[in-house]
A protein has these predicted regions:
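Long, low-complexity, charged/polar intrinsically disordered regions in eukaryotic proteins
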Residues: 1-31
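Positively charged, polyanion-binding regions of nucleic-acid-associated proteins
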Residues: 21-44, 55, 67, 73
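Short acidic, hydrophobic short linear motifs in intrinsically disordered regions
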Residues: 43-63
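Short amphipathic alpha-helical interaction segments
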Residues: 60-77
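Short, cationic-aromatic polyanion-contact patches
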Residues: 86-100
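A short, conserved structural fragment
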Residues: 74-87
Length: 100
């Protein structure tokens, strides 16, 4: 098994501030789909992003996985959800709902 370099593990460095959503999609729309995938226990960012992307596709929302991941990072940075690890590395970081 070859060891991955950090660059090879990075899935996306897109920042939410750099995202331009299509007119048919709002940040609130994405938040609903992302929160539907979250739980109190830690989940890999890759899982949350992948399932939110499936939900977007099922609703014909033209949103990429990079955009969803950027929104997840923005939610963590805003303190809306919790995250651990380098969130640009989807398989090596996790998110969850804030424990109350």
């Amino acid at each position: 098994m070859s060891e991955e370099s950090e660059e090879e593990r990075i899935c996306s460095t897109l920042r939410w501030d750099d995202v331009r959503l299509p007119q048919s999609v709002s940040a609130a729309d994405l938040d609903v789909l992302i929160f539907h995938e979250l739980a109190q226990n830690w989940l890999k960012v890759a899982r949350v992003v992948g399932r939110a992307k499936e939900a977007c596709d099922a609703r014909s929302l033209p949103v990429s996985m990079d955009v969803i991941a950027a929104r997840v990072r923005a939610l963590v940075e805003a303190g809306t959800i919790e995250g651990v690890g380098n969130l640009t590395m989807w398989r090596h970081s996790e998110v969850r709902l804030i424990a109350r």
